[in-house]
Amino acid sequence: MVSVSQSAQNYFLNLLKKQKYGTNIRVYVKYPGTPVAKCGVSYCYKDDVTRLDVAFTMNKFIVYVYKPHIPYLRESKIDINVEECNSQLTLIAPYANKCYFIKNNDLKRRVENFLNLNINPQLSAHGGKVDLMNITESGYLSLKFSGGCNGCSMVQKTLKEGIEKQILAKFSEFKGVYDITQHNRGNHSYY
């Protein structure tokens, strides 16, 4: 669980008073389990909360954390450091860089974890998601988009410029990715 000091809670409450009613706080990790993991804090609006978020109730507000990121935020502490005339919000997350993949995990499971921890949080901002459907013997991943990504006019750019580049950087075993989604453009499509 994320621990938030009383002074940090007061700081957040002061900030939240200036936001739209129902706004809370999100604690997140970018690139969890890697040497370049970065933790952060942001506003979390009602519409941003998904079924994959876990709510931690504080005094008068809620801190949301994306469920797959919880192991990386274990024993995390948010506090305010005051030095002379300055104060700074600090987030200490000792496990953000720790890799939780078990060495003998099969490749499919590692790719699914990578998608859930690194790709899907970005896609969820647009109401979208991507799932691994198959790994071919020739080294390609077949992916299926859903939600806001289904029918989105930017899906090929997302696939090649975003997802494929990240997967190839993380997994040397693969040659590329391709989309097997039967795209149906509709109100659910982001673009």
From Swiss-Prot:
The keyword Membrane does not apply. Keywords: 4Fe-4S, Iron, Iron-sulfur, Metal-binding. It comes from the Bacteria. InterPro entries: Fe/S_biogenesis_protein_NfuA, FSCA_dom_sf, HesB-like_dom_sf, NIF_FeS_clus_asmbl_NifU_C. [4Fe-4S] cluster binds at C149, C152. The keyword Cell division does not apply. One of its GO terms (molecular function) is iron ion binding. Binds 1 [4Fe-4S] cluster per subunit. The cluster is presumably bound at the interface of two monomers. GO terms for biological process: iron-sulfur cluster assembly; protein maturation. Its cofactor is [4Fe-4S] cluster. Belongs to the NfuA family. PANTHER family: FE_S BIOGENESIS PROTEIN NFUA, IRON-SULFUR CLUSTER SCAFFOLD PROTEIN NFU-RELATED. Involved in iron-sulfur cluster biogenesis. Binds a 4Fe-4S cluster, can transfer this cluster to apoproteins, and thereby intervenes in the maturation of Fe/S proteins. Could also act as a scaffold/chaperone for damaged Fe/S proteins. Homodimer. This is Fe/S biogenesis protein NfuA.
